[in-house]
Design a protein with these regions (language model features):
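Conserved residues at the C-terminal ends of beta-strands
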Residues: 40, 100, 207
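Active-site-proximal loop/turn and secondary-structure-junction residues that shape catalytic pockets
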Residues: 43-44, 72-74, 101-103, 133-135, ...
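A general structural detector for well-ordered alpha-helical segments in enzyme core domains, enriched
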Residues: 21-28, 51-58, 81-88, 112-116, ...
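Histidine-centered catalytic micro-motifs
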Residues: 3-12, 102, 128-132, 160
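Active-site gating/metal-coordination segments in enzymes
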Residues: 35-36, 46-128, 134
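Mid-to-C-terminal alpha-helical segments outside catalytic/metal-binding sites
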Residues: 1-6, 18-36, 122, 201-203, ...
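Conserved, mostly hydrophobic/aromatic
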Residues: 7, 29, 55, 88, ...
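Catalytic pocket-lining loop regions of alpha/beta-barrel enzymes
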Residues: 92-95, 106-205
Length: 247
């Protein structure tokens, strides 16, 4: 059974006062027998280009195990934004793009957010969006109009509204939009069981966010009495299909 963690970070963050070293990241991956991990900078990275380049180096160091995700502040010139996205996806092989609502102070409905959706559509890669902490920008419901406007774009709600804050709203968003998938880091095991049971295991993906949380997220799904098929879907198969991973 493959395990794919679609939400890992590398480097420092000035917004949330966090710092995940390569040693901490790879230690959690190896200790928890993760087959592949999607890695991105924190929103408060003091030098985001350096961190993206560090992730690209990790991809070469750990081929078929580490995959990069683009995470750029959308509040910049559109040509500059697109040029960096193009470089990372075309030249470095990154497999997704993130819109960090709270970290970059942006609503999914904002004018500057459209370039993020358009970039994901153009490159045919999934778009991940931070939800939960950071209201009003991080409301899961704000993604609904954009998911309907981009029906062929897979959109993953990181945190699924987060720890009872807006998890029900994330569920409603996924219920209304078949192209919305839920990543459940920091929500409870009861919510995870509910999502799998009601939405179907094909709509849920594993993400852990921080090395300290890796074992917890995996254990919750393994202790949820899911069928072998449902567990395999959530832990890895869905991510492999969504991101077209060759592992």
């Amino acid at each position: 059974m493959k395990i794919v963690d679609i939400h890992c970070h590398l480097g420092p963050c000035k917004v949330f006062d966090l710092d995940t070293s390569e040693e901490a990241l790879m230690g959690a991956i190896q200790k928890n027998k993760i087959d592949a991990a999607l890695v991105l900078p924190f929103p408060g990275a003091p030098d985001v280009k350096k961190i993206h380049n560090d992730i690209a180096k990790l991809m070469k160091k750990y081929p078929k195990k580490i995959f990069g995700v683009v995470s750029l502040n959308p509040h910049q010139d559109e040509k500059e934004y697109n040029a960096e996205v193009d470089r990372l996806i075309k030249d470095e092989g990154f497999v997704g793009i993130k819109l960090h609502t709270i970290g970059h102070a942006i609503s999914p409905l904002a004018t500057d957010a459209k370039k993020v959706f358009e970039a994901a559509k153009r490159h045919k890669v999934p778009l991940m969006i931070h939800t939960g902490a950071g209201i009003p920008f991080a409301l899961p419901s704000l993604v609904i109009p954009m998911a309907k406007a981009y029906p062929d774009l897979p959109i993953i709600l990181y945190h699924s509204g987060m720890a009872h804050i807006y998890s029900t709203e994330a569920y409603i968003a996924a219920k209304l939009c078949k192209n919305i998938y839920l990543e459940g880091s920091w929500i409870s095991i009861n919510e995870k069981i509910w999502f799998v049971g009601d939405l179907g295991s094909e709509r849920i993906v594993l993400g852990t966010d921080l090395p300290e949380n890796t074992a917890v997220e995996i254990f919750q799904y393994r202790s949820a009495n899911l069928s072998d098929k449902d567990l395999a879907n959530v832990l890895g198969e869905n991510a492999i299909k969504l991101f077209k991973l060759k592992i």
